[in-house]
Amino acid sequence: SLIRLFGSDGQFQGAVQTDSQWIQGMGKAKDGKVYLAYYDQSGNVKLSQIDFDGKALGQTYDDFPNTNGNGGLCAGIENDLLVNTDTALYDYSLADQKTTEVLSWLDSDINGSYVTYAAATADGKILAVVNDWNTGETDLVKLTRTKASEVAQKSQITIGTLYTSQSLQAAAVAFNKQSN
């Protein structure tokens, strides 16, 4: 894959060649640097800093979550990067190369496969763009951390499968949203 670099004036500055065939995502971390998530030749997901001056990939980080193409990376909450996967939202630490789960999409009555972007606000709320492939509807969702004891109890469907289809997951989420 080829990453083209442009300056703040919009002028082409050069390119960075990667050995990856599939880029997972890219974004700016808390440190103001831009990072690239991608598959390496062994199929593992890696994270590398983009060195704009050297026109190369910089330091590489391991144990990065697979974003399954939902790869809009942005500044983290407590750590460096907020990382969206199809099951959860994570805060990733560059120093420790570890993730901390921020939330489970299903626990928030959201089909994580439909989340195309997520970010944190300055006051700690989570904003997510949710694009429902089945209905064509797109929502901007704002999530606020709430203690489990403060959440109204309701009936929910839990489905255990080896692989869950998107339509089955969407049906369970829809039921869970509407149940009392």
Question: Model-predicted segments: where are they?
Answer:
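Short loop/turn segments that connect beta-strands within beta-propeller blades
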Residues: 6-11, 51-55, 94-97
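Short, well-ordered beta-strand elements
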Residues: 153-165, 180
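A short beta-strand motif characteristic of beta-propeller blades
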Residues: 11-17, 56-64, 100-109
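Short alpha-helix C-terminal cap/hinge motif
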Residues: 171-180
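Structural motif
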Residues: 2-4, 42-49, 86-93, 134-142
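Blade-level signature of beta-propeller repeat domains, shared across WD40, Kelch, NHL, RCC1
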Residues: 115-151
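Repeated scaffold domains used in trafficking and secretory/extracellular systems
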Residues: 18-31, 65-78, 110-121
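Residue position within the beta-strands of beta-propeller blades
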Residues: 36-38, 83, 128
